[in-house]
């Protein structure tokens, strides 16, 4: 019975760590995308765009 409880606790801990890691990665991606959106110069209406 204790072994089953330990396994369930470890599974719950791994799920919590995984979700917090995904949230952290998503927030980092949002910060980076916001930073690069600000840094890009606005496109000008050019005839020949490469």
Curated annotation (Swiss-Prot):
Primary location: secreted
Annotated compartments: Secreted
Example of a GO MF term: toxin activity
UniProt key word Ribonucleoprotein: no
UniProt keyword annotation of Secreted present: yes
Signal peptide stretch: 1-19
Domain of life: Eukaryota
GO CC annotation: extracellular region
Key words, A-Z: Secreted, Signal, Toxin
Family: Belongs to the neurotoxin 10 (Hwtx-1) family. 67 (Jztx-67) subfamily.
Protein name: U37-theraphotoxin-Cg1b
Organism, scientific name: Chilobrachys guangxiensis (Chinese earth tiger tarantula)
């Amino acid at each position: 019975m204790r072994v089953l409880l330990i396994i369930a606790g470890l599974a719950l801990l791994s799920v919590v760590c995984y979700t917090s890691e995904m949230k952290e990665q998503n927030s980092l991606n949002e910060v980076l995308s916001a930073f690069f959106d600000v840094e890009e110069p606005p496109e000008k209406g050019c005839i020949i765009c490469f």
